[in-house]
């Protein structure tokens, strides 16, 4: 009788597990709801106190972060494949290896806050809300792209995301301008202005520092230090590699950019600093890119394969999060494999769309050049007025 009862219960639970909703319920029962995780202390500059050295990670957050990081990783690898198949032309800068920066920054701010970055922008496009389909379609120059196929890799845009910028460092003063607008409007919003270690020596970056400090703008200057500006190591291009100290009178912090929780907590700290009216702050994210500078760079002429593999094996951001989730009973190997399979399917479907969606027609070439403002009050007062009908 007891054996028969056990068999019946086993069959009942087996049937329940076949149903996704019940399977998710049963899975959640065996996992912890949250875990307290230690994170590396940040190096501080002109700050008496920094971000916390421990934080709570919920199961829901962990699963979300893991999935988003996997999407970015697979999306970039698919972009590499499409480029080699000549579906993508021109410039293409990939961010695989830097997923913790992309996802961690978004986790530390509000959706209404603003982000502006350089040309390595695909990951931030995704975390700002764009779909994989629209990003890959933009890379292949299709109508369904986020910029209607006209921007390509370096010029993608989303709500409160002012895209990739092709000129090295040019986005930094623009970010200060966005922060000035936030202060002027008194809306409590901030701007994250991202740039790489290669752009950190640009004069316009220091000009933006100065004006932001002078006017106490709510701007977080973020240097993504991936150790190489194109093919030049940071030690060969900068007299000082303490990028978090380059703001002179602006406080700064150096963050482990391979750990999503370190990035998240540092971003929250920096955002609170700006929102409280203390002015700008500089964040240096120590990270690494697995690909070369761009698709035309194999990435092994100025660094060894062993160096890249060493970072992959010891500091990979997805691996670190996966290990943290499993060791804290926030997930299981089997559950994460299911997420991986789901992500792979999503990216494959997006790639199919990006290679079959039609290209924008020639008659769209002159569209979206001018904003259709109301007519000028004085007829004929502006010599360029007749060209506004081109769009």
UniProtKB/Swiss-Prot annotation:
Transit peptide: 1-30
Alphabetical GO biological process terms: glucose metabolic process; pyruvate decarboxylation to acetyl-CoA; pyruvate metabolic process; tricarboxylic acid cycle
Binding site for thiamine diphosphate: 119-120, 166, 168, 197-199, 226, 293
Control of this protein's activity: Pyruvate dehydrogenase activity is inhibited by phosphorylation of PDHA2; it is reactivated by dephosphorylation.
Cell compartments where the protein resides: Mitochondrion matrix
TM regions (residue ranges): none
GO CC annotation, single: pyruvate dehydrogenase complex
Keyword Cell membrane: no
Modification sites for Phosphoserine: 294, 296, 301
Tissues in which the protein is found: Testis.
Keyword entries, A-Z: Carbohydrate metabolism, Glucose metabolism, Magnesium, Metal-binding, Mitochondrion, Oxidoreductase, Phosphoprotein, Pyruvate, Thiamine pyrophosphate, Transit peptide, Tricarboxylic acid cycle
GO molecular function ontology, one term from the record: pyruvate dehydrogenase (NAD+) activity
Function summary: The pyruvate dehydrogenase complex catalyzes the overall conversion of pyruvate to acetyl-CoA and CO(2), and thereby links the glycolytic pathway to the tricarboxylic cycle.
Protein name: Pyruvate dehydrogenase E1 component subunit alpha, testis-specific form, mitochondrial
Species the sequence originates in: Rattus norvegicus (Rat)
The encoding gene: Pdha2
